[in-house]
């Protein structure tokens, strides 16, 4: 990338500081911007990063789940934003060599939490590929599975969860979501809904652009075709084994 283009990126990202994020997952959008600026050796606001990290730590409720702000709500915001952006902020700050916090150590701890959360997500997928629709922002569709896809992409799936079973589970969930439910309008764009056109499922901030957060579950596409995620023989996922009377790993509290 030429220097002029680099400086344009820096200028535009820096201009986002006018946004005063509320005490919610929005803090991580700010930390993502500032950690990027740190990594490219531009002027960055360390306070915006560290204050976001402190709040996310404060909002951890245990066993892989975060509260999106001071009051807990049962939704998929751990999937849409919190787990992925928390990990990415910590990784980027560590890569940038920023001193102050033990960003690498915090990343290791956050990774374990995401592994437990991804284990739960895998267990959410029913034997026939459905997963529960609950909480706000459900028109983001398959973005609910982003951390599971991310752990597959990282090569960091939790023990007892194989790459093949994740591939098979996600594939079946994609089929259930997109095969025959009128998910696209006449222009070929996604409709507002969890699966199909369900405008009543929208929140006031839902728009046609945000629907494409569903593509966040495509992270394993970053793996080469020769990767074991793609080449391993199909395997049943947890709920298939459980409902067919086969042995499956016992779940338990992690922390």
Protein language model features and the residues they cover:
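A beta-strand-loop signature enriched in Asp, Gly, Thr, and Trp
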Residues: 102-184
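Aromatic-lined, polymer-binding surfaces characteristic
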Residues: 1-111, 123-146
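Terminal, non-catalytic domain-edge segments
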Residues: 147-255
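Generic secondary-structure signature for well-ordered alpha-helical cores
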Residues: 39, 58-61, 90-94, 119-126, ...
